[in-house]
Amino acid sequence: MINVLVAGFKGSMGNKTIHMVANNDKFKLAGVYNPVVTEKNVNEVAEFSDLDAPVYTDYEQIPVNDIDVWIDFTIPSAVYQNVKFALENKISVVVGTTGLKDEQIVELKEIAAKNGIGGLIAPNFGISAVLLMQFAKQAAKYMPDVEIIEMHHDNKLDAPSGTAINTAKLIAEVREEHQQGNPEETESLDGARGANYEGMHIHSVRLPGYVAHEQVLFGSKGEALTIRQDSFDRESFMTGVALAVEKIGDYNELMVGLENLL
């Protein structure tokens, strides 16, 4: 039995994760963490009324020796300290929160390696999204002119999405940086061409009704290729989260990307 703590249990992904953990025979919901709530037990929240797990509002309350895996679906401003705390206390981490900076990830990897603890930071837990990133990396070897469009619900706090950034990073591994478009082009409206990552443009859309979607557009002389992925329900991410929780204890390093476990 894997004892799991969920941080960010009141968010959309945290909500789904609580139910996934509670309904998985291999996992035990050992607690939840949120520093700004008043509840003492998850069963005080209507949608979790049939569950029983303590709510921790301070790191000092958490029985670190009784927690095997820390799942984090919080907010960009909180995730670094959460993951640092877990790794320093030799708790494996499964992180879906976006917003970690490259230098923070480097530091967290060092902590994980020092303590021999496994961890996963996944920009996306959807299998289709992982496949999109791998397909895009392969395509970029032959079609290096590329732009990325990511589309999410209008409550998402960060832009571009972690999935889009990771897609760009994977493409950059096989593609030499070069200027796309007309070198003399100008923007009549600031930001019209989107964000720029090593010569690739990334465009972010935020609209109600969307969940998580991405398109990677490749162009070459006389042809074009579009790779698209759609997540219509957050339930689609739970297969990847469960896989990560089950496997992460077998590792002694912090990794980025669900593909490392597949």
UniProtKB/Swiss-Prot annotation:
Its EC number is 1.17.1.8
What SUPFAM superfamilies does the annotation carry? Glyceraldehyde-3-phosphate dehydrogenase-like, C-terminal domain (SSF55347), NAD(P)-binding Rossmann-fold domains (SSF51735)
Keyword set for this entry?
Amino-acid biosynthesis, Cytoplasm, Diaminopimelate biosynthesis, Lysine biosynthesis, NAD, NADP, Oxidoreductase
User: What is catalysed by this protein?
Assistant: (S)-2,3,4,5-tetrahydrodipicolinate + NAD(+) + H2O = (2S,4S)-4-hydroxy-2,3,4,5-tetrahydrodipicolinate + NADH + H(+); (S)-2,3,4,5-tetrahydrodipicolinate + NADP(+) + H2O = (2S,4S)-4-hydroxy-2,3,4,5-tetrahydrodipicolinate + NADPH + H(+)
Instruction: List residues binding NAD(+).
Output: G8, F9, K10, G11, S12, M13, G96, T97, T98, A122, P123, N124, F125
Active-site positions, per UniProt? H152 (proton donor/acceptor), K156 (proton donor)
Q: Give binding positions for (S)-2,3,4,5-tetrahydrodipicolinate.
A: H153, G162, T163
Q: Example GO molecular function term?
A: NADP binding
The species is Ligilactobacillus salivarius (strain UCC118) (Lactobacillus salivarius)
Q: Name one GO cellular component term.
A: cytosol
Q: Which GO terms describe its biological process?
A: diaminopimelate biosynthetic process; lysine biosynthetic process via diaminopimelate
EC main class here is oxidoreductase
Name by which UniProt lists this protein: 4-hydroxy-tetrahydrodipicolinate reductase
Tagged with keyword Cytoplasm: yes
